[in-house]
């Protein structure tokens, strides 16, 4: 009888996994930080949840596919170059129009999860969650419209008010809002979001796939960097990163013969940065496109030290996620940010780098020269960086924190 009972038990249907409906314009194969982070998160959550992502169009990819356990649905949307504000707005609009219909006819989820691309996607997510009477989780990577105002990209008070009307109510209505730092938590609470609903989960690196390598590696040799002292920026080349200061800093270091300043990435200000380097005859600056993630360990490890910049006044409105990959690669950091920024606090806490004021090329050049001349123990800073990456900022740790938040909401059940 025991054998029969065991056989019958094995025929019982497995309990259904909770269904997540995830909304964000950017996902794999996008090179955006949010695309990479969301892809890694969703693929990890697919082990315990049924995950569907509704994202924007990608050339050459099917409208619907299953990748690493995640169902990826791509709506019809434009894919114009995002460096031009109007074209980016068209991309946003076409994606949101496709998203509304596709999300509303989706299979009923147990949870709706939204990131913040475009910044006002939370308004759509709120409507979708209400339609299915399910909890809403918003994962906040940037605080809008404040970041655009601080950068001088949004000067119209009327437009700022409109954006706040589109964005802030969804944050206040969400069952949980995940932010990526304590300073950002304060910014969000200032918008009227209940502190009880806010959770802090920093972004992460992947200590399994990104690991320290020797400076003299294949990538370094291919780019003729193996025998040079390399200062690197790897990531978005946008308005928030304040990379003008890095290019200008090199003009104070013309006497450092073996110096190379390598800027890897793309973004709205890439062409301007190339033009600035030419104008200043900053011959030590090399600007390269995004590198394949498969060789990230090599490219990041080529640097003797990395620069992570953030424009003055942006602390808590955006957090450069690339710092976690740098830590995983076991490399030190020059944080050219306000002291209250998450990056500056992290570097000071871990002891993996030095802090300089943002937007100050001379101070940045002094830190670069000191690093080159051996005034810092770069090897020890790198060891601390890697140890922190393994123990505190690895993807597995962040994913478990997200699972804890999801379990809170799953226990709350449907909205009434």
Question: For each of these PLM feature ranges, what is it?
Answer:
Residues 189, 195-200, 205-221, 242:
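Acidic anion/phosphate-binding donor-loop and adjacent secondary structure
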Residues 57, 183, 201-204:
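Carbohydrate-associated surface elements
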Residues 123, 127-131, 157-179:
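Membrane-proximal helix-turn-helix segments that form the acceptor-binding/catalytic region
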Residues 2-71, 76, 396, 416:
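N-terminal subdomain of nucleotide-sugar transferases
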Residues 370, 377-391:
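A short, well-ordered alpha-helix in the C-terminal region of glycosyltransferases
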Residues 241, 290-298, 306-327, 332-345:
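Nucleotide-sugar-dependent
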Residues 264-265, 270-297:
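Nucleotide-activated donor-binding/catalytic signature segment of Leloir-type glycosyltransferases, i.e.
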Residues 222-241, 247-250, 262:
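Conserved donor-binding/catalytic core segment of Leloir-type glycosyltransferases
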């Amino acid at each position: 009888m025991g054998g029969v009972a065991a056989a019958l038990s094995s025929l019982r249907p497995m309990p259904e996994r909770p269904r997540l409906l995830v909304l964000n314009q950017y996902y794999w194969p996008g090179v955006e930080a949010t695309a990479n982070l969301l892809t890694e998160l969703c693929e990890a959550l697919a082990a315990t949840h049924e995950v569907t992502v509704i994202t924007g169009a990608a050339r050459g990819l099917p409208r619907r596919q299953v990748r690493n356990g995640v169902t990826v649905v791509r709506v019809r949307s434009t894919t114009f170059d995002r460096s031009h504000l109007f074209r980016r707005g068209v991309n946003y609009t076409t994606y949101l129009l496709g998203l509304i219909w596709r999300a509303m006819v989706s299979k009923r989820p147990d949870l709706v999860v939204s990131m913040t691309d475009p910044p006002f996607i939370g308004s759509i997510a709120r409507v979708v969650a209400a339609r299915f009477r399910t909890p809403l989780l918003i994962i906040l990577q940037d605080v809008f419209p404040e970041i655009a105002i601080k950068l001088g990209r949004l000067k119209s008070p009327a437009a700022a008010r409109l954006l706040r009307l589109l964005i802030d109510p969804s944050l206040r209505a969400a069952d949980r809002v995940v932010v990526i730092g304590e300073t950002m938590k304060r910014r969000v609470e200032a918008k009227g979001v209940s502190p009880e609903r806010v959770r802090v989960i920093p972004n992460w690196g992947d200590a399994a796939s990104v690991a320290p390598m020797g400076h003299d590696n294949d990538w370094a040799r291919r780019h003729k960097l193996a025998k040079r002292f390399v200062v690197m920026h790897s990531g978005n080349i946008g308005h928030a990163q304040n990379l003008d200061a890095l290019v200008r800093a090199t003009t104070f270091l013309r006497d450092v013969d073996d110096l190379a300043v390598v800027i890897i990435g793309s973004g709205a200000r890439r062409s301007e940065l190339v033009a600035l380097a030419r104008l200043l005859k900053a011959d030590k600056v090399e600007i390269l496109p995004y590198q394949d993630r498969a060789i990230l360990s090599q490219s990041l490890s080529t640097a003797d030290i990395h620069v992570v910049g953030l424009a003055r006044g942006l602390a808590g409105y955006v957090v450069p996620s690339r710092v976690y990959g740098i830590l995983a690669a076991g490399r030190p950091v020059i944080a050219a940010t306000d002291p209250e920024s998450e990056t500056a606090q992290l570097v000071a806490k871990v002891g993996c780098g030095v802090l300089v004021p943002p937007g100050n090329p001379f101070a940045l050049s002094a830190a670069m020269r000191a690093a080159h001349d051996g005034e810092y123990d770069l090897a020890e800073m790198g060891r601390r960086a890697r140890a922190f990456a393994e123990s505190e900022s690895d993807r597995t740790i962040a994913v478990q924190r997200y699972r804890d938040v999801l379990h809170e909401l799953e226990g709350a059940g449907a909205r009434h």
